[in-house]
UniProtKB/Swiss-Prot annotation:
Native organism taxonomy: Eukaryota, Metazoa, Chordata, Craniata, Vertebrata
Localization: Cytoplasmic vesicle, Clathrin-coated vesicle membrane
Function: Subunit of the V1 complex of vacuolar(H+)-ATPase (V-ATPase), a multisubunit enzyme composed of a peripheral complex (V1) that hydrolyzes ATP and a membrane integral complex (V0) that translocates protons. V-ATPase is responsible for acidifying and maintaining the pH of intracellular compartments and in some cell types, is targeted to the plasma membrane, where it is responsible for acidifying the extracellular environment. Subunit H is essential for V-ATPase activity, but not for the assembly of the complex.
Modified residues (Phosphoserine): 59, 483
Annotated membrane topology: Peripheral membrane protein
Gene name of the record: Atp6v1h
Organism of derivation: Mus musculus (Mouse)
BP GO annotations: synaptic vesicle lumen acidification
Protein name: V-type proton ATPase subunit H
Family classification: Belongs to the V-ATPase H subunit family.
Length: 483
């Protein structure tokens, strides 16, 4: 990976402001371990160890102690977490564990080694903490789990990993709901604090996705839709950056690049790039674009991503970005790389590639191919390729889009397809397209009504020449002016 990966990985492990501030407050409130010992809530062994551990101020002193007493350390921390219920003390224990791991990543091994002795895994010690009520406790536990999973030699697997990823998805989705204006139960947490806790969750995901095996598990858990949902809503630039960082990490795997084709990621990222005022957001989008073009091993996949970028006007954005000065040389290198690759793709661009890319982006407009008799004559049959992939997208747009221009162009294209492909009517009917077009004959927008009517008539009529003469008198002025 590039050096940016290392920077990002460090960013992901650093706590957000609210957690850092609360952790400082927690550290300052020392625990009276003797009172727990007198109350018989902890053992003399654990009490003695934790007091000695607290006295080790320097990292070197702690390391020396952990090398000889690592097992006791893990045992004591787990015993304390298990037997003490007071929230303030649990916060203190988790903060000590998190500090210890942050100081030296290799220390995660003490928990794995201890668990192995009892023929268990480290996860059951920390996963139940995610169900607690206190947000600081929950998010500290989440950070520790991510560090154990990302830095340990043993992978989190099966139901433990599913549970953790589902928890992350739920937290990120709560942010998505907040962005859409839906009321979300956040207890006494302010929206500012809440967004910082969500950034902490995103940081956990960033750490996890540095491990290739977790990338596949995240995708299988429908995690990409979760990321896209957050990005599609209004979220702060920091969370935006973290979500795109996660996409960038996923795109290091050639198999992932192949899989990510289905999520329409390029239009969303190009919109964010267009509006971005933060250099770090610009940088991570360009790096993600580069991964899509560089890590994909299949030529067809690379070409599809390149065409999507061209369709979304990324070339123009790159030319504008090229004029600016950057402190980060990665940005300049990525701009140069992308300009070169997209420039090559433009040279190879056929009218069908252009049409296919526009259709897959879901952003239909009256580009020249739609009105080109030659295009439809030569390419109508190609809409049947890959089990009618493009026709299915076309009919889906008629079903779900609320953009009048998209609906008008889609209805027009259905009509042109059936006009130029002899068995087109039957195919469109089987895909439910005929009914969808008919539904738009009474649309409030005149262009949608007109193109739906035209398409329905093409679905019904056999004499195209006669139909053409009939329609000239019906064509609305706006359409006449455009053509």
């Amino acid at each position: 990976m590039t050096k940016m990966d290392i920077r990002g990985a460090v960013d992901a492990a650093v706590p957000t402001n609210i957690i850092a501030a609360k952790a400082a407050e927690v550290r300052a409130n020392k625990v009276n371990w003797q009172s727990y010992l007198q109350g018989q809530m902890i053992s003399a062994e654990d009490c003695e160890f934790i007091q000695r551990f607290e006295m080790k101020r320097s990292s070197e002193d702690k390391q020396e102690m952990l090398q000889t007493e690592g097992s006791q350390c893990a045992k004591t921390f787990i015993n304390l977490m298990t037997h003490i219920s007071k929230e303030q003390t649990v916060q203190y224990i988790l903060t000590m564990v998190d500090d210890m791991l942050q100081e030296n990543h290799q220390r995660v091994s003490i928990f794995f080694d201890y668990a192995k002795r009892s023929k268990s895994t480290a996860w059951p010690y920390f996963l139940p903490m995610l169900n607690r009520q206190d947000p600081f406790t929950v998010h500290m536990a989440a950070r520790i789990i991510a560090k154990l999973a990302a830095w340990g030699k043993e992978l989190m697997e099966g139901s433990d990993l599913n549970y953790y990823f589902n928890w992350i998805k739920t937290q990120l989705s709560s942010q998505k709901l907040r962005g859409s204006g839906v009321a979300v139960e956040t207890g006494t947490i302010s929206s500012s604090d809440s967004s910082q806790y969500v950034q902490c969750v995103a940081g956990c995901l960033q750490l996890m996705l540095r491990v290739n095996e977790y990338r596949f598990a995240w995708v299988e858990a429908d995690g990409v839709n979760c990321i896209m949902g957050v990005l599609s809503n209004k979220c702060g630039f920091q969370l935006q950056y973290q979500m795109i960082f996660s996409i960038w990490l996923l795109a290091f795997s050639p198999q992932m690049c192949e899989h990510l084709r289905r999520y329409n990621i390029i239009p969303v990222l190009s919109d964010i790039l267009q509006e971005s005022v933060k250099e770090k957001v610009t940088r991570i989008i360009l790096a993600a674009f580069r991964n899509f073009l560089e890590k994909s091993t299949e030529r067809e996949t690379r070409q599809e991503y390149a065409l999507a970028m061209i369709q979304c006007k990324v070339l123009k954005q790159l030319e504008n970005l090229e004029q600016q000065k950057y402190d980060d040389e990665d940005i300049s290198e990525d701009i140069k790389f992308l300009l070169e690759k997209l420039g090559e793709s433009v040279q190879d661009l056929s009218s069908f590639d252009e049409y296919s890319s526009e259709l897959k982006s879901g952003r239909l407009e009256w580009s020249p191919v739609h009105k080109s008799e030659k295009f439809w004559r030569e390419n109508a049959v190609r809409l049947n390729e890959k089990n009618y992939e493009l026709l299915k997208i076309l009919t889906k747009l008629l079903e779900v889009s609320d953009d009048p221009q998209v609906l008008a162009v889609a209805a027009h294209d259905v009509g042109e397809y059936v006009r130029h492909y002899p068995r087109g009517k039957r195919v469109i009917e089987q895909l439910g397209g005929k009914q969808l077009v008919m539904n738009h004959m009474h649309h409030e927008d005149q262009q949608v009504r007109y193109n739906a009517l035209l398409a329905v008539q093409k679905l019904m009529v056999h004499n195209w020449e006669y139909l053409g003469k009939q329609l000239q008198s019906e064509q609305p002025q706006t359409a006449a002016a455009r053509s």
